[in-house]
Protein backbone atom coordinates (compact mmCIF):
# COMPACT_ATOMS: atom_id res chain seq x y z
CA UNK A 1 0.00 0.00 0.00
CA UNK A 2 2.85 2.36 0.80
CA UNK A 3 4.40 1.64 -2.60
CA UNK A 4 1.12 2.36 -4.37
CA UNK A 5 0.66 5.55 -2.34
CA UNK A 6 4.20 6.65 -3.22
CA UNK A 7 3.56 5.92 -6.89
CA UNK A 8 0.34 7.96 -6.86
CA UNK A 9 2.09 10.89 -5.21
CA UNK A 10 4.91 10.71 -7.73
CA UNK A 11 2.46 10.87 -10.65
CA UNK A 12 0.79 13.93 -9.17
CA UNK A 13 4.03 15.71 -8.33
CA UNK A 14 6.03 15.24 -11.53
CA UNK A 15 4.49 16.45 -14.74
CA UNK A 16 6.18 15.33 -17.93
CA UNK A 17 6.74 16.54 -21.45
CA UNK A 18 4.04 15.41 -23.88
CA UNK A 19 5.43 13.59 -26.91
CA UNK A 20 2.20 13.52 -28.86
CA UNK A 21 3.32 11.95 -32.12
CA UNK A 22 6.03 10.21 -34.08
CA UNK A 23 7.70 12.06 -36.94
CA UNK A 24 10.06 11.73 -39.87
CA UNK A 25 13.03 10.38 -37.92
CA UNK A 26 11.03 7.59 -36.30
CA UNK A 27 9.22 6.68 -39.51
CA UNK A 28 12.42 6.78 -41.57
CA UNK A 29 14.10 4.43 -39.12
CA UNK A 30 11.11 2.12 -38.75
CA UNK A 31 10.51 1.66 -42.47
CA UNK A 32 14.08 1.82 -43.78
CA UNK A 33 16.60 0.91 -41.05
CA UNK A 34 14.83 -1.54 -38.76
CA UNK A 35 17.17 -4.58 -38.72
CA UNK A 36 14.39 -7.10 -38.09
CA UNK A 37 10.64 -7.26 -37.55
CA UNK A 38 9.81 -6.32 -33.98
CA UNK A 39 8.78 -9.17 -31.72
CA UNK A 40 5.36 -9.09 -30.10
CA UNK A 41 7.10 -8.36 -26.79
CA UNK A 42 8.90 -5.34 -28.26
CA UNK A 43 5.67 -4.05 -29.78
CA UNK A 44 3.90 -4.42 -26.43
CA UNK A 45 6.66 -2.56 -24.59
CA UNK A 46 6.73 0.21 -27.21
CA UNK A 47 2.98 0.71 -26.72
CA UNK A 48 3.53 1.03 -22.96
CA UNK A 49 6.33 3.55 -23.48
CA UNK A 50 4.38 5.59 -26.05
CA UNK A 51 1.44 5.74 -23.67
CA UNK A 52 3.75 7.08 -20.94
CA UNK A 53 5.35 9.64 -23.25
CA UNK A 54 1.98 11.04 -24.29
CA UNK A 55 0.36 11.01 -20.84
CA UNK A 56 1.56 14.40 -19.60
CA UNK A 57 3.23 12.72 -16.62
CA UNK A 58 6.90 11.91 -16.25
CA UNK A 59 7.71 8.38 -17.38
CA UNK A 60 9.65 6.31 -14.85
CA UNK A 61 9.83 2.85 -16.36
CA UNK A 62 12.05 -0.20 -15.84
CA UNK A 63 12.69 -2.22 -19.01
CA UNK A 64 13.79 -5.77 -18.28
CA UNK A 65 14.99 -8.28 -20.87
CA UNK A 66 17.71 -10.84 -21.51
CA UNK A 67 20.88 -9.95 -23.40
CA UNK A 68 19.95 -9.99 -27.08
CA UNK A 69 16.23 -9.42 -26.51
CA UNK A 70 16.25 -6.04 -28.25
CA UNK A 71 16.22 -3.52 -25.38
CA UNK A 72 18.61 -1.18 -27.21
CA UNK A 73 16.31 -1.09 -30.24
CA UNK A 74 13.35 -0.15 -28.04
CA UNK A 75 15.48 2.51 -26.34
CA UNK A 76 16.51 3.95 -29.71
CA UNK A 77 12.93 4.16 -30.98
CA UNK A 78 11.95 5.91 -27.74
CA UNK A 79 14.74 8.44 -28.28
CA UNK A 80 13.59 9.05 -31.85
CA UNK A 81 10.12 9.91 -30.54
CA UNK A 82 11.71 12.45 -28.18
CA UNK A 83 13.78 13.93 -31.02
CA UNK A 84 10.76 14.13 -33.34
CA UNK A 85 9.01 16.19 -30.65
CA UNK A 86 11.89 18.67 -30.40
CA UNK A 87 13.86 17.22 -27.48
CA UNK A 88 17.28 15.72 -26.82
CA UNK A 89 18.02 12.29 -25.34
CA UNK A 90 20.89 10.59 -23.54
CA UNK A 91 22.01 7.11 -22.53
CA UNK A 92 24.13 6.53 -19.43
CA UNK A 93 26.01 3.22 -19.09
CA UNK A 94 28.12 2.03 -16.12
CA UNK A 95 31.33 1.34 -18.10
CA UNK A 96 33.20 2.83 -21.05
CA UNK A 97 33.03 -0.53 -22.85
CA UNK A 98 29.24 -0.64 -22.64
CA UNK A 99 28.89 3.06 -23.55
CA UNK A 100 31.14 2.50 -26.57
CA UNK A 101 29.09 -0.52 -27.57
CA UNK A 102 25.87 1.53 -27.47
CA UNK A 103 27.55 4.29 -29.48
CA UNK A 104 28.70 1.89 -32.19
CA UNK A 105 25.42 -0.03 -32.32
CA UNK A 106 23.17 3.03 -32.42
CA UNK A 107 25.43 4.79 -34.91
CA UNK A 108 25.15 1.82 -37.26
CA UNK A 109 21.37 1.59 -36.83
CA UNK A 110 21.00 5.30 -37.68
CA UNK A 111 23.08 5.21 -40.87
CA UNK A 112 21.49 7.48 -43.48
CA UNK A 113 19.34 9.33 -40.93
CA UNK A 114 20.27 12.89 -39.96
CA UNK A 115 20.64 12.33 -36.22
CA UNK A 116 23.71 13.70 -34.43
CA UNK A 117 25.13 11.43 -31.72
CA UNK A 118 28.30 11.75 -29.62
CA UNK A 119 30.14 9.70 -27.00
CA UNK A 120 31.27 11.16 -23.67
CA UNK A 121 33.33 9.15 -21.18
CA UNK A 122 36.00 9.79 -18.58
CA UNK A 123 38.70 9.36 -21.22
CA UNK A 124 37.18 11.87 -23.67
CA UNK A 125 39.64 14.61 -24.61
CA UNK A 126 39.14 18.19 -23.44
CA UNK A 127 38.58 19.42 -26.99
CA UNK A 128 35.89 16.79 -27.53
CA UNK A 129 34.19 17.69 -24.24
CA UNK A 130 34.09 21.36 -25.24
CA UNK A 131 32.57 20.54 -28.61
CA UNK A 132 29.95 18.32 -26.99
CA UNK A 133 29.01 21.00 -24.44
CA UNK A 134 28.57 23.61 -27.16
CA UNK A 135 26.56 21.24 -29.34
CA UNK A 136 24.25 20.34 -26.47
CA UNK A 137 23.50 23.95 -25.60
CA UNK A 138 22.86 24.87 -29.24
CA UNK A 139 20.58 21.85 -29.76
CA UNK A 140 22.76 20.60 -32.62
CA UNK A 141 23.40 17.33 -30.76
CA UNK A 142 20.43 14.97 -30.57
CA UNK A 143 21.74 11.98 -28.61
CA UNK A 144 24.55 11.88 -26.06
CA UNK A 145 25.84 8.47 -24.97
CA UNK A 146 28.24 8.12 -22.07
CA UNK A 147 29.20 7.00 -18.60
CA UNK A 148 29.09 8.83 -15.25
CA UNK A 149 30.71 11.69 -17.20
CA UNK A 150 27.16 12.72 -18.15
CA UNK A 151 26.65 13.78 -14.53
CA UNK A 152 29.40 16.43 -14.63
CA UNK A 153 28.23 19.98 -14.01
CA UNK A 154 29.50 21.29 -17.34
CA UNK A 155 27.27 18.83 -19.23
CA UNK A 156 24.14 20.91 -19.80
CA UNK A 157 21.37 20.20 -22.29
CA UNK A 158 19.27 22.74 -24.13
CA UNK A 159 16.17 20.58 -23.96
CA UNK A 160 16.64 17.12 -22.45
CA UNK A 161 13.46 15.11 -22.90
CA UNK A 162 14.46 11.48 -22.31
CA UNK A 163 17.11 9.82 -20.13
CA UNK A 164 17.94 6.15 -20.59
CA UNK A 165 20.02 4.38 -17.94
CA UNK A 166 21.49 0.97 -18.75
CA UNK A 167 22.14 -1.59 -16.03
CA UNK A 168 20.00 0.32 -13.54
CA UNK A 169 21.22 -1.62 -10.50
CA UNK A 170 24.72 -0.12 -10.91
CA UNK A 171 23.40 3.42 -10.39
CA UNK A 172 21.74 4.98 -7.37
CA UNK A 173 18.60 7.06 -7.07
CA UNK A 174 20.77 10.13 -6.39
CA UNK A 175 22.52 9.70 -9.73
CA UNK A 176 19.19 9.48 -11.53
CA UNK A 177 18.14 12.67 -9.76
CA UNK A 178 21.28 14.46 -10.96
CA UNK A 179 20.25 13.77 -14.53
CA UNK A 180 16.78 15.13 -13.77
CA UNK A 181 18.41 18.35 -12.63
CA UNK A 182 19.90 18.91 -16.08
CA UNK A 183 16.49 20.38 -16.96
CA UNK A 184 14.12 22.87 -15.40
CA UNK A 185 11.43 20.25 -15.92
CA UNK A 186 12.25 16.57 -15.28
CA UNK A 187 12.82 14.45 -18.41
CA UNK A 188 11.23 11.08 -18.99
CA UNK A 189 13.25 8.20 -17.49
CA UNK A 190 13.71 4.70 -18.94
CA UNK A 191 16.04 2.35 -17.06
CA UNK A 192 17.13 -1.01 -18.46
CA UNK A 193 18.44 -4.21 -16.96
CA UNK A 194 19.30 -7.70 -18.18
CA UNK A 195 19.06 -9.04 -14.63
CA UNK A 196 15.88 -11.13 -14.22
CA UNK A 197 13.77 -9.57 -11.46
CA UNK A 198 10.39 -11.05 -10.43
CA UNK A 199 7.66 -8.41 -10.72
CA UNK A 200 6.87 -8.47 -6.99
CA UNK A 201 10.55 -8.01 -6.12
CA UNK A 202 10.83 -5.23 -8.70
CA UNK A 203 7.96 -3.45 -6.94
CA UNK A 204 9.91 -3.68 -3.70
CA UNK A 205 13.28 -2.62 -5.11
CA UNK A 206 11.99 -0.05 -7.60
CA UNK A 207 8.66 1.05 -6.22
CA UNK A 208 8.87 4.33 -8.13
CA UNK A 209 9.13 2.56 -11.49
CA UNK A 210 6.58 0.94 -13.78
CA UNK A 211 7.85 -2.37 -15.15
CA UNK A 212 8.00 -3.62 -18.75
CA UNK A 213 9.42 -7.01 -19.73
CA UNK A 214 10.74 -8.18 -23.11
CA UNK A 215 10.25 -11.92 -22.71
CA UNK A 216 10.87 -12.93 -26.32
CA UNK A 217 14.02 -13.07 -28.47
CA UNK A 218 14.11 -11.68 -32.05
CA UNK A 219 14.04 -14.27 -34.87
CA UNK A 220 17.35 -16.08 -35.29
CA UNK A 221 18.78 -15.01 -31.95
CA UNK A 222 20.38 -17.81 -29.96
CA UNK A 223 19.28 -17.78 -26.29
CA UNK A 224 21.97 -16.57 -23.89
CA UNK A 225 22.96 -19.15 -21.27
CA UNK A 226 23.92 -18.08 -17.76
CA UNK A 227 26.13 -20.62 -15.99
CA UNK A 228 27.70 -20.86 -12.54
CA UNK A 229 31.01 -22.52 -11.69
CA UNK A 230 32.87 -22.92 -8.42
CA UNK A 231 36.45 -21.77 -7.93
CA UNK A 232 37.68 -25.35 -8.18
CA UNK A 233 36.37 -25.45 -11.77
CA UNK A 234 38.43 -22.45 -12.86
CA UNK A 235 40.51 -24.42 -15.40
CA UNK A 236 37.35 -25.87 -16.89
CA UNK A 237 35.97 -22.35 -17.32
CA UNK A 238 39.16 -21.08 -18.97
CA UNK A 239 39.11 -24.01 -21.38
CA UNK A 240 35.47 -23.34 -22.23
CA UNK A 241 36.21 -19.65 -22.87
CA UNK A 242 39.13 -20.51 -25.17
CA UNK A 243 36.93 -22.87 -27.18
CA UNK A 244 34.15 -20.29 -27.55
CA UNK A 245 36.57 -17.58 -28.70
CA UNK A 246 38.13 -19.99 -31.20
CA UNK A 247 34.63 -20.47 -32.66
CA UNK A 248 34.16 -16.66 -32.86
CA UNK A 249 31.52 -16.59 -30.13
CA UNK A 250 31.17 -14.34 -27.10
CA UNK A 251 31.38 -15.37 -23.46
Q: Which role does the model predict for each range below?
A:
Residues 1-28, 32, 76:
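Interdomain "pre-motor" coupling segment immediately N-terminal to P-loop NTPase/helicase cores
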